């Protein structure tokens, strides 16, 4: 008789109620003979406390129904740890015998407190632990303390809120955790006896006593937990294998005792251990020598238990339910792989289906340990470079629920579930592990990540770059960069004026990579041809757009892109300015055309009125003549016939002459208006050229520039332009560059030129204007050029603006400003400093004095610096915007300055609106008196 039969005979229906579970679990095997302790050996000692235990169970069950909501409890110790045999025999992966100490003891696992939501089963476990502690105390002491009972009862009633992350005591961990499992122990042993699973027989004494749990027998425990409250011991540590429905078309429905169809069973399969996910193979791996353990949770949600099953289109009574396991090939599900189960002697046997019961509105948990695949998958060996074999084969672990009937030996399939793809290997798992360099790669769901940098197609890593790719990148999406203002600081707007100049300096070229570079980078002939920029040239224009990564220079194309954006913005502003100017000109032309149309209409109406008066006059004459002839006699009509014809012909000639005269006058007026319009247009576009005569023929590029002969023209009078050093308040003031005799000074206080005749006041002497007796010009209200450019003479406190323009010599539309600066005879023959202020985005270029072909420079005849200086005027840059002009040594001299976005504007022939030209012409007033 087997050990299971002995246990079944001992635990009959009469003795099941006297079963002492705590004594059976805590008492060790006899060290001398190795015999098994009977679970009912001390059943008599339990009779005295049975009434108290039943009362406690009723109280706890009542509290269970009140606390049906899910409560978090500290994660319990795993039922079967990875390296410890929970059955008290041997380790699952160690070669030591069953006498060896465990890898780690439950007594040393007190700090384990991971959160796990077990649904309503949590309250059952807490209550079961407390009840088991009381029973253990009764067994050892023989009585139960009533104050402790009342204290526990009060604690259970006051438990209204969930408790999170509470630390369990050592006694609570070491005690059994399921009271309902104790109450159904007889069904467990009977199911184990039917399945042929013998109880363990301890052949040798142990080194020390430890907890005995008969795990070789499938554990069946009904639970009140819902379908979503299944505990997964490996959930927080590693990825768990999943099971899905399998061969659903072969399932058979269940019926109750009234032949009413029942709802489908809620089945949840959990692999407690034995399957590890391998990121390199992208699937789960099982070692053939290591067993795996499966827990199946079956819940029936109907009020009636299943009694019949549909078999061959008729209802057949169900004898019992079985749970079986098998493996199938992933590529051919019809090919089954046998599943074996190891027993206490570590010898594998063919797995026998496990019997279990299905109760109404209850959940049944079946735990089947020590399962093995009888075969390994094919093509497990690596091909090259430790990469997975492309011809790798896989298994599927199938869990089947059968209903045993009398008409079929194999039973009827109720439900079946298959796992994900599994690789079963028999060799050392370390041979399939990646190299040390690949340890940093991890998989989180469907994402593969690493903490370090990644290089694709190259062994070199660019400094501070997380990803380095040697080759092309194909992307169907977008590159998204975080640009939230909450992430940024020190935000400043860049000037867009220089962007156009920067883009004009860039050179876009077509090029090919060198053959040796193409060989290293793996580029074909088509990929060698590129269009882009040269890093060295870009570095000279935009230094922040080029980075040095060590061997070569790289270009930040994003920086170049934003430079083009700024240039586009500047072009839009310039286009807007041009549009506004064009609109102004169009409006002016429209106004003139309207005036011309009104004048033409007025002239036409006048001509039509004149023609109408002549016709009415002739008509009236004719009518009077006809009336007179009718009133006279017939003889007088023949006499006056000739006179009437002469009068009619005379009136017709008069009207024709009048019309011709008026038409001629209108034509002359039109010609005159056209000539005036053309002259006005010419005057507006070409300024003051009608006043000047050039010594040399002007070219196309010099049409609007100053090309004059001072001998033939000088401004006769500039009433709005202050003369430099116009007044002198010292009778002994010396004159320069003027050969004529100084005028006689009657008033000893002042010597003034023609400016005093216009009502200019003579300013009194002050410490600020008595330097050498020469007064500085007052700072009158000036008229700016409206371009942002300001020209000043700091030593004289004079600003050169539009007051110094002659007629239309300053043309803002063409960007040319010819400024005539009169200088008095009291100005010394020394150099003069001027200051030109331009906007931040523009640069002032010193183009020097006018060449002799464009301007006739006249040197002072009595200049003290004539022998040492050149007869050609000079313009020297002293500081950024301060220049020194040698105008004091000349009677007349001209200098050119250009303000633009580039420093090369002096070499440009045509401005095209890219710069503004300022021509400063200095002339002494003594030339007027001498001429």
Swiss-Prot record:
Residues 37-52, 117-126 have a biased composition (Polar residues). Residues 169-436 bind DNA. InterPro entries: MRF-like (IPR051577), MYRF_C2 (IPR025719), MYRF_ICA (IPR026932), NDT80_DNA-bd_dom (IPR024061), p53-like_TF_DNA-bd_sf (IPR008967), S74_ICA (IPR030392), WH-like_DNA-bd_sf (IPR036388). Disruption phenotype: Worms show normal dorsal D (DD) GABAergic motor neurons rewiring but show larval lethality. Worms lacking both myrf-1 and myrf-2 display defective DD neurons rewiring. Its EC number is 3.4.-.-. Myelin regulatory factor: Follows autocatalytic cleavage via the peptidase S74 domain. Autoprocessing is apparently constitutive and is essential for transcriptional activity. Residues 1-658 are cytoplasmic. Glycans are attached at residues 797, 912. Gene3D superfamilies: Winged helix-like DNA-binding domain superfamily/Winged helix DNA-binding domain (1.10.10.10). The record marks 482-483 as: Cleavage. Residues 680-931 are lumenal. GO terms for cellular component: apical plasma membrane; basal part of cell; cytoplasm; endoplasmic reticulum; endoplasmic reticulum membrane; nucleus; transcription regulator complex. GO terms for molecular function: DNA-binding transcription factor activity; peptidase activity; sequence-specific DNA binding. CDD domains: Peptidase_S74_CIMCD. Changing residue 488 to A: Lethality at the larval developmental stage. Only localizes to the cell membrane during viable stages. Defective synaptic rewiring of DD GABAergic motor neurons. Keywords: Activator, Autocatalytic cleavage, Cell membrane, Cytoplasm, Differentiation, DNA-binding, Endoplasmic reticulum, Glycoprotein, Hydrolase, Membrane, Nucleus, Protease, Transcription, Transcription regulation, Transmembrane, Transmembrane helix. The keyword DNA damage does not apply. Residues 29-143 are annotated as: Disordered. Belongs to the MRF family. Myelin regulatory factor: The peptidase S74 domain, also named Intramolecular Chaperone Auto-processed (ICA) domain or Intramolecular Chaperone Domain (ICD), has protease activity and mediates autocatalytic processing of the protein to generate the Myelin regulatory factor, N-terminal active transcription factor and the Myelin regulatory factor, C-terminal components. Homotrimer. Interacts with myrf-2. Interacts (via C-terminus) with pan-1 (via LRR regions); the interaction promotes the role of myrf-1 in the synaptic remodeling of DD GABAergic motor neurons at the cell membrane. This is Myelin regulatory factor homolog 1. It comes from Caenorhabditis elegans.
């Amino acid at each position: 008789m087997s050990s299971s039969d002995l246990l079944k005979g001992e635990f009959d229906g009469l003795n099941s109620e006297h079963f002492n579970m705590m004594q059976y679990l805590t008492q060790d095997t006899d060290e001398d003979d190795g015999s098994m302790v009977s679970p009912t050996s001390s059943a008599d000692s339990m009779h005295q406390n049975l009434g108290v235990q039943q009362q406690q169970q009723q109280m706890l069950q009542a509290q269970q129904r009140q606390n049906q909501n899910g409560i978090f409890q500290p994660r319990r110790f795993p039922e079967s740890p990875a390296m410890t045999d929970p059955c008290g025999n041997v380790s699952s992966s160690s070669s030591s015998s069953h006498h060896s100490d465990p890898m780690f003891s439950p007594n040393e696992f007190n700090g384990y407190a991971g959160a796990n939501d077990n649904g309503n089963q949590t309250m059952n476990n807490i209550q079961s632990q407390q009840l088991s502690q009381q029973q253990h105390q009764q067994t050892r002491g023989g009585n139960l303390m009533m104050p402790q009972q009342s204290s526990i009862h009060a604690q259970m009633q006051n438990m209204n809120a969930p408790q999170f992350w509470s630390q369990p005591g050592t006694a609570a961990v070491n005690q059994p955790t399921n009271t309902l499992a104790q109450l159904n122990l007889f069904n467990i042993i009977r199911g184990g006896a039917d399945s042929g699973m013998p109880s363990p027989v301890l052949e040798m004494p142990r080194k020390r006593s430890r907890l005995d749990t008969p795990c070789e027998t499938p554990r069946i425990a009904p639970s009140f937990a819902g379908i979503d409250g299944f505990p997964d011991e490996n959930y927080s540590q590693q990825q768990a294998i999943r099971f899905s429905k399998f061969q659903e078309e072969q399932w058979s429905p269940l019926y109750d005792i009234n032949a009413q169809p029942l709802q489908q069973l809620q089945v949840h399969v959990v692999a407690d251990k034995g399957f590890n996910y391998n990121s390199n193979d992208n699937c789960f791996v099982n070692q053939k020598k290591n067993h795996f353990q499966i827990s199946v949770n079956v819940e029936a949600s109907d009020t009636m238990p299943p009694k019949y099953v549909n078999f061959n289109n008729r209802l057949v009574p169900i004898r019992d339910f079985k749970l079986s396991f098998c493996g199938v090939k992933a590529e051919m599900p019809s090919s089954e792989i046998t599943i074996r189960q190891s027993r206490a002697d570590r010898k594998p046997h063919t797995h026998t289906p496990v019997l279990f019961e299905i109760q109404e509105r209850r959940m049944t948990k079946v735990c089947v340990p020590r399962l093995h695949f009888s075969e390994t998958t094919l093509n497990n060996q690596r091909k090259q470079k430790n990469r997975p074999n492309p011809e790798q084969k896989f298994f599927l672990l199938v869990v089947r629920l059968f209903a045993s009937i009398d008409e079929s030996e194999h039973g009827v399939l109720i439900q079946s579930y298959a796992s994900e793809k599994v690789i079963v290997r028999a060799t050392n798992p370390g041979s399939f592990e990646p190299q040390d360099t690949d340890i940093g790669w991890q998989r989180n769901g469907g994402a593969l990540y690493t903490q370090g940098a990644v290089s694709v197609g190259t062994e070199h890593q660019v400094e501070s770059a997380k990803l380095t790719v040697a080759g092309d990148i194909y992307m169907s999406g977008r590159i998204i960069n975080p640009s939230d203002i909450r992430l940024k600081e020190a935000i400043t707007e860049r000037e867009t004026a220089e962007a156009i100049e920067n883009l004009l300096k860039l050179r876009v070229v077509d090029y090919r990579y060198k053959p040796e570079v193409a060989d290293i980078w793996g580029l074909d002939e088509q990929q060698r041809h590129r269009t882009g920029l040269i890093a060295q040239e870009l570095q000279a224009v935009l230094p922040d757009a080029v980075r040095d990564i060590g061997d070569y220079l790289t270009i930040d194309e994003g920086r170049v892109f934003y430079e083009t954006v700024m240039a586009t913005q500047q072009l839009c502003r310039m286009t807007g300015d041009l549009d506004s100017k064009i609109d102004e000109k169009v409006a002016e032309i429209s106004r003139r055309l309207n005036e011309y149309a009104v004048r033409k209409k007025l002239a036409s109406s006048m001509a039509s009125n004149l023609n109408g008066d002549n016709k009415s006059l002739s008509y009236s004459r004719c009518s009077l003549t006809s009336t007179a002839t009718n009133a006279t006699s017939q003889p007088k009509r023949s006499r006056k016939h000739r006179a009437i014809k002469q009068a009619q012909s005379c009136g017709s000639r008069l009207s024709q002459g009048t019309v011709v005269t008026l038409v001629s006058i209108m034509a002359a007026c039109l010609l005159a208006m056209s000539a005036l319009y053309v002259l006005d247009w010419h005057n507006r576009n070409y300024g003051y050229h009608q006043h000047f005569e050039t010594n040399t023929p002007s070219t196309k590029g010099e049409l609007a520039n100053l090309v004059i002969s001072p001998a033939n023209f000088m401004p006769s009078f500039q009433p709005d332009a202050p003369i430099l050093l116009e007044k002198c308040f010292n009778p002994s003031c010396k004159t320069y560059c003027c050969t004529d005799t100084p005028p006689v000074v009657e008033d000893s206080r002042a010597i003034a030129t023609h400016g005093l005749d216009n009502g200019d006041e003579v300013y009194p002497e002050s410490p600020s204007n008595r330097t050498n007796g020469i007064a500085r010009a007052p700072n009158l209200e000036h008229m700016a050029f409206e371009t942002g450019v300001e020209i000043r003479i700091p030593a004289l406190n004079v600003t050169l603006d539009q007051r110094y323009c002659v007629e239309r010599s300053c043309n803002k539309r063409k960007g040319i400003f010819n400024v005539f600066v009169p200088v008095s005879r009291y100005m010394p023959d020394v150099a003069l400093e001027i200051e030109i202020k331009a906007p931040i985005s523009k640069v002032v270029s010193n183009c020097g004095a006018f060449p002799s072909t464009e301007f006739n420079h006249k040197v002072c005849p009595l200049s003290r610096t004539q022998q040492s200086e050149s007869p050609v005027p000079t313009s020297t840059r002293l500081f950024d915007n301060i220049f020194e002009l040698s105008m004091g040594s000349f009677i007349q001299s001209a200098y050119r300055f250009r303000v633009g976005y580039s420093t090369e504007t002096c070499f440009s022939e045509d401005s095209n609106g890219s710069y503004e030209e300022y021509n400063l012409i200095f002339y002494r007033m003594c030339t007027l008196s001498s001429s």
